[in-house]
Amino acid sequence: MENNTSLQQQLLEAGVHFGHLKKKWNPKMLPYIFAEKKGIHIIDLNRTVDHLQESAAAIKQIAKSGKKIMFVATKKQAKEIVSECAKRVNMPYATERWLGGMLTNFNTVRKSVKKMQSIEKMLADGSAESLTKKERLTLTRDKDKMEKVLGGIAQLGRLPAALFLVDIGHEHIALSEAKRLGITTFGMVDTNCDPNKEIGRAHV
C-alpha cells in the first residue's frame, strides 16, 4: 500500500492526473475519470497505478523471457527520454517517425536496415575511399537519413513480442500494424482516447 501511495504521489507531482478538455473526451474513458475541474477531466490515479503495475508485471515477464519490446514515441516531447530509456535496457525503439510497414512489411524494412549497415561498414573500414568526394558525401547523407528512422531497430532481427506506445492516439498506425499481426501492445491513454484499442494499457 505504501508503494502505491508513493507512486501515486509521484504521478500527482508530474501532473499525470490532468486529462484533456471535457469537450474532447472519449466517453469510453468514463471509468477512469475521477472528476472535472475547470473544464478539464482529472484522471483517477488509483486506476492508473493499478494498470501501471499490471502492465509493468507483464512487460517484465516478456523481457525476462529474452523477447524484445519495441518502444514507440514520435511526439516531440517524449522522443528523447524514450530513446534514452530504450537504449539503456537494450530494447528497440522508433522515435523519429513511424515508417509505414515497419511491422507488417518487416522483411522489406530489414533490407533497408542491412543497406544502412553496409554503408556504415564502407565508411568505417575505408572501402568508400575509392569513391569520389561527392559520392562519399551522398553515401553519408543516405546513411544519416536512414539511421534517423531505422537506427532504433538496427539490432531487431525479428518482429518484437510487444509494443509500448507512449500515446495510442498519436501512434495509431503502429497500433494498427501490431493488432493486425497479433503483437501485444501496451499504451498510455489520455481522456480523448479509446481505452479498448490495445491489450495491456496504462491510462495516463
Model-predicted segments: where are they?
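Nucleotide-binding motor/catalytic cores of P-loop/tubulin-like NTPases across gene-expression machines
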Residues: H170-E198
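N-terminal cationic and glycine-rich segments that engage phosphates or anionic surfaces
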Residues: M1-K68, T74-K75, K79-M122, K133-R136, ...
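Glycine-rich phosphate-binding loop
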Residues: Q155-A178
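Conserved small/polar residues in nucleotide/adenosyl-binding loops
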Residues: A202-V204
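Short hydrophobic alpha-helical runs that function as membrane-insertion/retention elements
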Residues: I69-M70, P92-T95, F164, T184-M188
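Short gly/ser/thr-rich secondary-structure transition/capping motifs
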Residues: K143-L150
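Short His-Asn-centered micro-motif
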Residues: V72-K75, L165-D167
